[in-house]
Amino acid sequence: MPKQSIQSVEPNIADLVNGWLKSYNLNYKLEQESLNDSIDKALDEYKSKQGGTGGNRPDCKLLAKDSYGTDYPVLIEYKGYKDRLIKLDENGNVAIKTSDNKNDYKKINSYAVNGAVHYANALLHYTDYTDIISIGVTGWKDENGNLQHEIGVFYVSSKNFGYGQDVAKYDDLSFLKPENFDTFIEKVKSLNLTEEEKSKSIEKREQEISASLVKLNNDIYKNESGLSESARIYLVAASIIANLGIKGENPVKPLEKSDLKCSSEKGERDGDIMLRKINAFLSHKSKNIPEDKKNLIIQTFSDALLTNENINKPTNGESQLKRVFSKVIDDLGLYYKIGLTTDFTGKLFNEMYNWLGFTQDKLNDVVLTPSYVATLLARLARVNKDSYVWDFATGSAGLLVAAMNIMIDDAKSSIKSPDEFKKKEAEIKATQLLGLEILPQIYMLAILNMILMGDGSSNILNKNSLSDFNGDYGFPPKERIEKRDLKFPADAFVLNPPYSASGNGMIFVEKALGMMNRGYAAIIIQNSAGSGKATEYNRNILKHSTLLASIKMPIDLFVGKSSVQTNVYVFRVGEAHQKDDIVKFIDFSEDGYTRTNRKKASVNLRDTNRAKERYAEVVDLVRFGKNKLNIFTEKEYYEGTIDPENGSDWNQSAPVDTKPTLQDFKKTVADYLAWEVSNLLKNKAEDSLGK
C-alpha cells in the first residue's frame, strides 16, 4: 500500500488556542479581522510569508495591556505538524533571513515561531511599537489519536534587534490572562543578551544594513534619473529624519507614505509636507540642536526638496520624491528604528559614492573609516566617559560615533544611578564631542548620523578646521558661557584626514595636537606621511607630543574605495618625544578579516581569522607592551626608537635576523641528505625496472 501522507491538525490547534483565549476573556482578532489601524497598515506594508506584496495575516492577534497601561502586540501563528514549531539559523536566532539577506520565506511560511517573528518585524519597521510578543503553536496526533501541542514564546524588541528571545516553556497561554500578564512582562524585561549575543546580533544586522544600502542605491541609480549624488544624499537624509517621529509629550508622528499626496499645489507638494515634518522634528529637539544649526539644516533640506520641481512633479499619479521616500523607509526603516549604534550614514555614504566616477585622488579623500577601525582609533586614544573628543575632518562622524559609544558604555558600567547615568549620557552627547567637516553634503550626513545616535550633533560644525577654527565650542554649554570659557577642552583626538592635504593630512594633526595640553591621539593616514611626505610636520609634532606606536594596516582595508597603504599613529599629547622613547611598531597586515569588492554582494567583509581578538590585542600591545603578545609574535611586533629630528623614520618593522644558527646548519644538512637518499632510491628503482 502507498504510504499515506500525514494530515495537518492546524484547524484543531486553532480551535484549541482560540478556545483558551476566549476562556481568558481576551479581545483577540482572527486572521481577517482588524486589530488597529497602525498594526493593520504595517502588516499590509510588509511582504507576505510567500514573498508577495502585502497581506501579512497572523492567524491570531491581540493587544495585551500591563497594569501601567502599556500595550503589547501579541502575534500568534499556528501549524499542524510535529516538527513545525521553530527553525533556528547558524547563530541560534529564529531564521527569517537567508545568507544573502533576503527574507527566508520557506522557513517563515513553514514554521510557526518563524512566521510570528517575521510579523513582529513588520511592527518594529512600520509602527511605534518596540516590544512585541510572538507566539508559535504547532500540534500533532499521537499514536492513540490524541491531540498534542507545543508552544514557543518569543520576545521581539528593538532591544534584541528584532531577532527575538525565547522567554520560557509554556503548556498554555494563560500567561496572557490579565491577572498573570504583569508577572510575564517582568520575566520578559529580565531577559538580557550576553555581550557575545549582542555583538553577533549587531554584526548580523550591520551586514543586513550593508546589503539593504546596496539594494537602495542600485534602485535609485537605475530608476530615478536626474538625481545627483548630493541630491540623493539629501533626499535619503530628509526621508529618514521625516520618518523618525518622537514619542512622549508633544509627540511628532512619523511621516508615512500615505501622508504624501503627490499634489502640484504650492505649499502642499510632497516636498512641502516632508519639510514641515522635519521642522516639527527639529523644533522638538531644540534643546539639543541650537537654533542656528536648526535653521541651517532646514534651509539645506528646503533647497533639496523644493528647488528641483521635477522631484515633486506627479507622473502617473506619483512624484519622484514619494518613490524615493518609499524606497528609503522600506529598505532601511527597520534598522534605524531598532536603534543600532552603528555608523549608519557612514555606510550609506560609502555605498552612495561607490557608484560614482570619481578620480582616484578624490576617492582617497572622501573614503570613510570602517566602523571597526573607528572603534580601534577611539580605543587607542584611550577614550572614556570623561573624555573630550574632537575630529578635524569628521566625514559622516563615524569616528565620533565610535567614541560616543565607548564613552556611554563606560558611563553605563561605572554609574549605578539611572538618573545620574541619564544626565551623563546627555552631557556626553551635547558637550564632549566636537567635529569639523568642510564639505556641505558630508556635513549633513554627520548631522544625520549623530541625530540617529541620539542628538549628539550640537558641536558638529561646517567649518574649515585649518583656517576657520580657533578651538572654541561651536555651541558652548550654558555654564561655559557664564564662565566665559569657550575653549573645547580636548583630551582625545581621532582622525582619518583627506590624504591630498598637505603632508598627506599631517597638517591637521599638527594643528589639533598643538591646541591640546594633554591626552592621546590616534590617526589613520597614508603611510608615506611617516616616511618622507610630512617630515616638517612630524618634527613639529614631536616637539610637544610623543609617538607611542606605528601600526601598519592591511593593504586592502579600503578595498573598492581607495588603494593606498595606511598606518595608524598613536600619540601621547603634551610631552615632547625624546630620542630614547620606545615606539611600538606593529605589522597589522593580517587583521583577520577577508574583504571582497563585489558591488552587489550582501557581505564583503568576513571574520575569517580571529579578527575581533586581533583588534583587541593591538590595543593591549600599544598600552601594555609585548607581554600582551598572544596571536601576534615578535615577527609582527617590534620595539624601537626614532630620531625626533628626522620625521621620516616612523614606519619601521622588526629586523630580520640573517645570522645562521647551528640549528639552521643542521636543518640544511638534513634536507640535503634526504634529497640524496631520495635520488639514490629513485635511480635504484629505475634500474630494477630496466629503464
What are these regions (language model features)?
Residues N25, L123, A381, M407, ...:
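Active-site catalytic pocket residues across diverse enzymes, especially alpha/beta-hydrolases
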Residues M1-I133, T138-G152:
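A short, conserved, highly charged catalytic patch centered on acidic carboxylates
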Residues Y81-R84, K107, Y170-S174, P178-F181, ...:
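A conserved structural/catalytic subdomain of Rossmann-like adenosyl-cofactor enzymes
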Residues A237, I241, G245-G357:
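Long recognition/docking surfaces used for binding and targeting
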Residues D89-N101, Q207-L227, V328-G333:
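Short amphipathic alpha-helical segments and their helix-coil junctions
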Residues D15, V214, S230-A238, S326, ...:
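Non-catalytic, well-ordered alpha-helical scaffold segments
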Residues F181-E249:
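Non-catalytic accessory regions of SAM-dependent methyltransferases
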Residues N364-R480, F488-L495, S502, R518-G519, ...:
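Conserved S-adenosyl-L-methionine
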